[in-house]
Amino acid sequence: MILSDKDIFDYVNSKRVLIEPFNSKFVGPCSYDVTLGSEFIKYKDDVYDLKKNLSHNKFEIENSIMVCPLNHHLDETIIENYKEKYNVDCVVSGGLLGTTNEYVELPNDVCAQYQGRSSFGRVFLQTHQTAGWIDSGFKGKITLEIVAYDKPVILYKNQRVGQLIFSKTLSPADIGYSDRKCSKYAGQKSVMASLIKKDFEIDEEE
């Protein structure tokens, strides 16, 4: 059962669902809009070896970032020209990780799904790849996987980037996501790189 606007207000007001900060203007008919934070991660590895720690740079923006497609040629001169012409803090090509401003806590009988905004899809910008599912009992900020597929796109800190759709489960989970020992991203309050390496460690322990 998907929560309507009335349900979302009820769950937030009764503190069964926590959204911090909460803006009543961001409540839709059956969703809640979330906004872009200031922290990002850009991977440095030429190859993603998923059994190893992934090398990356973590950085912050003051106002805006230009996201270019992977095959978009960038060099120092082009980057500086883009920064000056479009007044952006940072210019990157390829995929990068971002995070929402919003910190969310779900009870064990509510799960959620993140969806990118249709307006972004219409300029061929995706803000999540496969990680749109949020398990019951999750606590933390939502990580975004950002890719531009056509032309460079300028994103602004604090702009609405997607929405959360909340669903009531038939029964509460016995162990919520953030209470499971093997949950890798429980309580995340900042952008986090992939911890898939830990999957292999868990398998070896078993």
From Swiss-Prot:
Active-site annotation: E145 (proton donor/acceptor)
Q: What is its EC number?
A: 3.5.4.30
Q: Name one Pfam family in it.
A: DCD
Query: Which residues bind dCTP per the record?
Result: R117, S118, S119, F120, G121, R122, D135, T143, L144, E145, Q163, Y177, K184, Q188
Catalytic reaction annotation: dCTP + 2 H2O = dUMP + NH4(+) + diphosphate
Any single GO BP term: dUMP biosynthetic process
Disulphide bonds annotated for this chain are: none
**Which SUPFAM superfamilies does the record associate with it?**
dUTPase-like
One Gene Ontology term of the molecular function aspect: dCTP deaminase (dUMP-forming) activity
Query: What keywords tag this UniProt record?
Result: Hydrolase, Nucleotide metabolism, Nucleotide-binding
Q: Where does the entry annotate site (Important for bifunctional activity)?
A: G132, W133
Q: What does this protein do?
A: Bifunctional enzyme that catalyzes both the deamination of dCTP to dUTP and the hydrolysis of dUTP to dUMP without releasing the toxic dUTP intermediate.
Family assignment? Belongs to the dCTP deaminase family.
Known partners and oligomeric status: Homotrimer.
The protein in question is named: dCTP deaminase, dUMP-forming
**Source organism per UniProt:** Methanococcus maripaludis (strain C6 / ATCC BAA-1332)
